[in-house]
């Protein structure tokens, strides 16, 4: 194994041991010393906290007003039933939330297989027990809301302003969206030729059956790679804030007086006084204009009316006039 002293080893062996449909062991080697813990801990945290999945978030049980109660003919109390519902493994295709229904009567266990659902929903563990009915006349009816999410979201975090509008009897459930039930990693020694200081990463994990363990690790690695992309080329990814520069003067003030369409007599009088722009004109007062040769009161009235129609008037004060664009002409 020859190479540059600065060159890092890349894993060449990936072994996947499928213990069961929900349990797998993944071995990755060789890794440079220390990278076993670096990658193992990062993948473990992502698998536990950031994997998307579906979970029960709300439940309505006929005859039950709150979670601190019991139901006649049912062995478990309501809190225990809610706890069992948290363990319900559900796969939902193409939807972010669905409503499932359950109706069961007679003595015996109530399982996930008793839940009624459409073709977009799959109950992964139909044998999962929700409660037990202890009387021939006992019955239980539920409406179960399943939502898509990520990580763990307690019911208290979903209580907001609409809480007061929530119907009595609708029970909130702590939502554990992550399909990963258990994850552990171990770093063992590995050897390549003469090097004996290398790492071998062994990841062992169990899921609830809604995702294949191999696929879960693949997704976690993808999430990690996407988050690290920003460090590959360290640039400020924030978009620069574009500040709109407000013009120093109203654009109409920069237009020539010819745009006012005054009579020939009035226009010629203004040009004789070097009044070429509307900004020049509005700074003049009535007294100043009346001193202009050949400009009488009739022309003054015309000018005032035309300016008023554009929201302007005589005698205005303009700081820093004329602007550089005009002064240079």
Swiss-Prot record:
GO cellular component: cytoplasm; DNA-directed RNA polymerase complex
Ranges where the record places region Alpha C-terminal domain (alpha-CTD): 249-329
Superkingdom of origin: Bacteria
Stretches for region Alpha N-terminal domain (alpha-NTD): 1-235
Family (UniProt): Belongs to the RNA polymerase alpha chain family.
Assembly, per entry: Homodimer. The RNAP catalytic core consists of 2 alpha, 1 beta, 1 beta' and 1 omega subunit. When a sigma factor is associated with the core the holoenzyme is formed, which can initiate transcription.
Function: DNA-dependent RNA polymerase catalyzes the transcription of DNA into RNA using the four ribonucleoside triphosphates as substrates.
NCBIfam families listed in its UniProt record: PRK05182.1-2 (NF003513), PRK05182.2-5 (NF003519), rpoA (TIGR02027)
Annotated protein name in UniProt: DNA-directed RNA polymerase subunit alpha
Originating species: Sodalis glossinidius (strain morsitans)
């Amino acid at each position: 194994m020859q190479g540059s002293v600065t060159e890092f080893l890349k894993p060449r062996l990936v072994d996947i041991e499928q213990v069961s449909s929900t349990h797998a062991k993944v071995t990755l080697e060789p890794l440079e010393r220390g990278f076993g813990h670096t990658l193992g801990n990062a993948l473990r945290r992502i698998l536990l906290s950031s994997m998307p999945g579906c979970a029960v978030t709300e439940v309505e049980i006929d005859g039950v007003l709150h979670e601190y109660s019991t139901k006649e003919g049912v062995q478990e109390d309501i809190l225990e039933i809610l706890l069992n519902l948290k363990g319900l493994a559900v796969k939902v295709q193409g939807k972010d939330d669905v409503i499932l229904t359950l109706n069961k009567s007679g003595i015996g266990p109530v399982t996930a297989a008793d839940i009624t659902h459409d073709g977009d929903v799959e109950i992964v563990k139909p044998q999962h027990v929700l409660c037990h009915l202890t009387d021939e006349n006992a019955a239980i009816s539920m409406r179960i809301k399943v939502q898509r999410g990520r990580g763990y979201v307690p019911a208290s975090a979903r209580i907001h302003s609409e809480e007061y509008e929530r119907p009595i009897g609708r029970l909130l459930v702590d939502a554990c969206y992550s399909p990963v039930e258990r994850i552990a990693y171990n770093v063992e020694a590995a050897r390549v030729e003469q090097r004996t200081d290398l790492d071998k990463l062994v990841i062992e994990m169990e899921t609830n059956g809604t995702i294949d363990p191999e696929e879960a690790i693949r997704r976690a690695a993808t999430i990690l790679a996407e988050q690290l992309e920003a460090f590959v080329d360290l640039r400020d990814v924030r978009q620069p804030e574009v500040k709109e520069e407000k013009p120093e003067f109203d654009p109409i003030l920069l237009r020539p007086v010819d745009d006012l369409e005054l009579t020939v007599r009035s226009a010629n009088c203004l040009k004789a006084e070097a009044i070429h722009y509307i900004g020049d004109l509005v700074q003049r007062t009535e007294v100043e204009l009346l001193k202009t040769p050949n400009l009488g009161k009739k022309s003054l009235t015309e000018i005032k009316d035309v300016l008023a129609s554009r929201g302007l008037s005589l005698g205005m004060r303009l700081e820093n006039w004329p602007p550089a664009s005009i002064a240079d002409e």
